[in-house]
Regions:
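Active-site/ligand-binding surface loops and adjacent short beta/alpha elements
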Residues: 4, 93-94, 176-259
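Acidic-aromatic substrate-binding/catalytic surfaces of carbohydrate-active enzymes
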Residues: 35-91, 96-97
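Extended, loop-rich substrate-binding clefts of extracytoplasmic carbohydrate-active enzymes
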Residues: 96-150
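Beta-strand-rich interaction surfaces with strong enrichment in secreted/lumenal proteins
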Residues: 143-145, 295-300
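Short, Gly/Pro- and small/polar-rich lid/capping loops
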Residues: 2-32
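Short Pro-Gly-centered flexible turn/kink motifs
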Residues: 85-93, 157, 299-315
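Acidic, contiguous internal or C-terminal segments within carbohydrate-active enzymes
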Residues: 36, 128-180
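Glycine-rich active-site loops that engage anionic ligands at enzyme catalytic sites
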Residues: 247-283, 288
Length: 315
């Protein structure tokens, strides 16, 4: 076998050293006045605009994703207290990637490289295989599909247990609806939810309460005002099509199908890059800390799958 020439080696190395986007592969979608960009990093949604107006508070192609913008959160959304949980007799410990609160947060796949497996002008599908890891010794095949249509942007997600034993599962997403030039304070918010989860200083739910008569009651649309939202809502009122719809003024509506019983609302006050310039409306299949509390937790048997969908359309 002959030796490789220097030129051959340079050809091999050049792709490795070529600059890449911090968010990886970019799939650009368009339909009429709508445009969206989905990315290989975490299978996330980097931007969504209509007629040149940003519906989402996204980030640039040369920027690193910050504050969870547009990320997918699996195999759990939000937090796990102490990163510790028990499942089928196994005591498991996850890395504490929110060290200031001693929590595990937002799953294991949002910083992983997903593969774009299908791509058309108005649609892209990405997949990722989550191998067993310390703290989550289970195998999941994940797929997300983003599509543009007359009813806006639709996101379909599917998870399949490809391991040999049952596994705990939940999924969420972290899009921020943009407030435009101003703050969210003046925008009317409509959240058709009867119940809010009450969290402690570590953002772990410790109780649940009716929103009736509280500042958290947005069942009738009203301006957000100065309230700092970092609350999980549930007991959602659904329309005849089974969808629950969260509406933000003249910005957008985010809907969830029946596989998402929870929606997290976050005005981003502790995060300078998003604080009150946008509001995260986070679809979630389970409550925060579900791996410990069991609230909304999905059990996937070997070969079992879970599917869900949510979407956004402009006002």
């Amino acid at each position: 076998m002959g030796m490789k020439r220097a030129g051959d080696i340079q050809q091999i190395l050049r792709p490795v050293h070529a600059p890449i986007s911090p968010s990886g592969e970019q799939a650009e979608l368009s339909l009429g006045e709508q445009t969206a960009v989905v990315v290989g990093l975490g299978g996330g949604l980097r931007s969504y605009s209509v007629d040149g107006r940003a519906v989402l508070d996204g980030y640039g192609v040369e920027e690193m994703c910050a504050s969870g913008r547009g990320q997918l959160l699996a195999p759990w959304p939000n937090r796990i207290e102490d990163g510790a949980y028990e499942f089928d007799g196994q005591r498991l410990q996850l890395a504490l990637d929110e060290p200031e609160r001693q929590n595990a947060i937002h799953g294991l796949v949002r910083w992983s490289r997903w593969s774009v497996v299908e791509e058309d002008d108005d649609r892209a599908a990405l997949e990722y295989l989550l191998h067993p890891t310390p703290g989550y010794p289970f195998a999941l095949a994940l797929r997300v599909e983003y599509s543009l249509g007359e009813d806006g942007l639709t996101v379909r997600v599917e998870a399949t247990n490809v391991g040999r034993e049952a596994c705990p599962y939940g999924i969420g997403a972290h899009p921020y609806l943009a407030a435009g030039e101003g703050l969210v304070d003046e925008l009317e918010l409509h959240v058709p939810a009867e119940t809010a989860l009450i969290a402690d200083e570590r953002s772990i739910p410790v109780d649940r309460a009716s929103v009736e008569g509280t500042d958290l009651d947005f069942r009738t649309p009203k301006p957000i005002g100065p309230i700092e939202l970092d609350h999980c809502y549930t007991d959602l009122e659904r329309d005849d099509d089974g969808r629950a719809r969260v509406r933000l003024g003249q910005v957008a509506t985010l809907w969830v199908d029946e596989s998402y019983p929870y929606v997290m609302l976050f005005t981003g006050d502790p995060l300078p890059d998003v604080a009150r310039h946008s509001i995260a409306v986070e679809p979630m299949t389970c409550a925060p800390n579900a791996f410990r509390s069991g609230e909304g937790l999905i059990r996937l048997e070997p070969g079992g799958s879970h599917r869900g969908s949510w979407g956004i359309y402009p006002a």
